[in-house]
Amino acid sequence: MKGDRIWVGYRCDMQVTPLTGKFGADVADIDISQPLSAHELSELREAFAEYSVLAIREQDLTIDSFEAFALQLGNFGETPFITPVDGHPNVLRLLREADEAGPLFGSGWHSDWSFQDQPPSATLLYGVDIPPAGGDTAFTQQEQAYDALSDGMKELLEPLHGVHSARRSYGPSGTFGQRDDRRSMEIIGDESALETRSHPLIRTHPDTGRKSLFINEVYTIGIEELHHAEASAILNFLFEHCRRIDFTCRVRWQQGTLTMWDNRCVQHYAIDDYFGHRREMMRVTLAGETPQ
């Protein structure tokens, strides 16, 4: 289906427009505020498997319909360190006021919560209040990053495990480790952020069977089998390699856009270029599996 401009389903006419020649797509002519038919859901899943990032345009979602749509795709994932919306324990309100300074939540290339035993399979983000310009989300496709490595590098990485931790972001001395009353979001770091989890540097997607790199500069702090200096040299090369421009796409937000991405094979980066404008989003993650 990749490269097609219009994707016509068996019983639904869902328009899928690729964002690049490799991955990412805009989706139109589908209403996710109502329960999807089995055919619509199947078409959406097929597009997601093909493109890894879907920006579903012109939606009108309440918090309840947002949750209901997510639950058609899977169970909710666990969300640490951030206070959820009252009465909706799985929904985060990502808010940045127009005059708010300080670190932007979601900046830096990362895969959500890769420090968990079972990181999220996917993230869903919905635009409630969007700046007139700026605030794009950039994505980089890690299956492409893996494919572009030499056979020798693939062989070197295959048996190795990355060490993941939330310490740099949510540990006591991390970016969001201390309470800040000037911050709109209530982010509460704690000692649990110092814990580590090991996952394969190369993981296999459970649905597609495709291999991808599974590291990121925010949460990957070492390689289990290597000394620190050795691991740093390899990781720094991989961090640079992973964000090559030809592996990337960008989603330009509009009010009513829901973007969903596959955390198992995609990293993302929130771009901080809209100071002076308010931005509000709703976010959920979907439960994943232990990386293999």
What are these regions (language model features)?
Residues K2-L258, N263-Q292:
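Non-heme Fe(II) oxygenase catalytic core, chiefly the N-lobe of the double-stranded beta-helix
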